[in-house]
């Protein structure tokens, strides 16, 4: 029975992962008016962009699309960068995370599709399509690392993030370090191509088997700060989070303590209560803020290891945006 239950759980996690990889965002990308021969009259570029992908992957086609309108005809695709309402967007963060951080509407609840391109609800109408601006000059060096023509800067940033996640899961980065050059390149290519089967073939080498728990769970929490805080607009909270924690004992129960479990599953609620107790005074119910992942509000009861196995981005991390309530 236990084996059957584990298999059913794996099927469920696999279906969630497929839904995550199928998720897309409609983007409306406009050339910066200062770089356009027609100022603000250039037609925008429209695309349904995979949530797990990265904005720089769009630069070659955007450079070709806007080529007739560019004042500077010699600009190169890798010189492109994106902004939203004047804010340069970090190119090393996935598209879905960037949207949830800067423009996300009220998160979808249980039962809502991950794909925002399908019949968006009224709560999404004001934010979709997500309107971005692409620039091919005036690179913001103080905020963004420059890209290169061969794409190695982007590749290396991705692989470094994979290494961090691998180290947290296993207590060592031996897995990613011993990947062949072909598999290392293939992992990044699978994310670019949104090829889940090719991705799973390689990423499963790095994951502990389902019956072996992670050492720690690679999760980062993003907290928005008020504009007048004098700090960057985002704060990232990260701490080693084991998938299991010491079990809490209910003294009112008359159970034999010798038969009580030594540990219990770490849920998202227990992790948030531990890291951010002022925002999450309850382990079970969102009171002041709610966690958002892939555009959806995440149940506080979700085991954090299962979140990573089913909902991680391509680099192995779960990126959760904390959205204030009310």
Swiss-Prot record:
InterPro entries according to UniProt: Atg5, ATG5_HBR, Atg5_HR, ATG5_UblA, Atg5_UblA_dom_sf, ATG5_UblB
GO (cellular component) term, any one: phagophore
Subcellular location per the Swiss-Prot or TrEMBL entry: Preautophagosomal structure membrane
PTM text: Conjugated to atg12; which is essential for autophagy.
Similarity comment text for this entry: Belongs to the ATG5 family.
Subunit structure: Conjugated with atg12.
Record-given protein name: Autophagy protein 5
UniProt organism field: Aspergillus fumigatus (strain ATCC MYA-4609 / CBS 101355 / FGSC A1100 / Af293) (Neosartorya fumigata)
